[in-house]
Amino acid sequence: MSPDPRKPTKAQRQADARTRARAMREQRERAERRRRAGLVTAAALAAVAVVSVVVVAILAGGDDEVPQAVPASFSESGGFTVGDPGAPVAVSIYQDYQCPFCAQFEAANTDFLEERREAGDVAVTYYPLDLLRRLGDYSERSASAAVCVAEEAPEQFPAFNDALFANQPQEGAGGLTDQQVAALAAEAGVPDEVESCITSGRYTDWVTQVTDARDERVEGTPTVLVDDEVVPADQFQAAVDAALAGAPTS
């Protein structure tokens, strides 16, 4: 009997089997490639997410390290100079407006400094600090107010500096309100437009950072330097006069 031509031969069946096997193998390989691609994509997305979190954390941390406002008229170390910067004698005063010894130093030496400054003999650099922050926020608020005045009404800074010490509240008693400090500024001739800087505490963060990064020789207030040498407060005037006597004449 002759074979049925519609029935595939053994060779044809083997070829069909190989074709189906190859197709199944290629399908499995495509599925495996898709699976691996998915894993790579997921890993990449996870890495991006981690980087994003790190960047956000760094930026958030940076907000704590960079003060919101930085005064342009102060040095990098936090000092504001009154008088001729080229004067033969340089005086630096590190002070806290809540410090009673600073108020005593100011009362004893304000006239002396004014005379020497106006004569062109002395340049005075003031460093408003908040070393007594543990007693409340008045140190930083008053120091910030002093920075506001130095920035926006520098000619009135000496008078406002005197007024803050002359009206110094009892140490640790809470201090003057921002409105009372602004009123002292107005009495010292500071323009009204400076009030918002004072009452907003614009430079409090900056004051705290300057205090924390202060000269290592400043262990308390007042700390007074004459030509970069620390001198006892009760020997200050003698130290200035000695420096003037030894200064070269022009």
Task: Name these PLM-found stretches.
Residues 81-83, 114, 215:
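Short secondary-structure boundary/capping segments
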Residues 2-39, 43-51, 58, 183-250:
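C-terminal cap of thioredoxin/glutaredoxin-like
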Residues 91, 99, 224:
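Conserved S/T- and glycine-rich ATP-binding loop of Class I adenylate-forming
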Residues 52-73:
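C-terminal region of N-terminal signal peptides and the immediate post-cleavage residues
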Residues 45, 55, 84-87, 91, ...:
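Hydrophobic/basic alpha-helical segments enriched in Actinobacteria
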Residues 71-89:
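A short beta-strand-turn-helix
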Residues 87, 95-97, 103-178, 186:
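Structural alpha/beta surface segment adjacent to cysteine/selenocysteine redox centers
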Residues 93-96, 218:
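Processing junctions and N-termini across compartments
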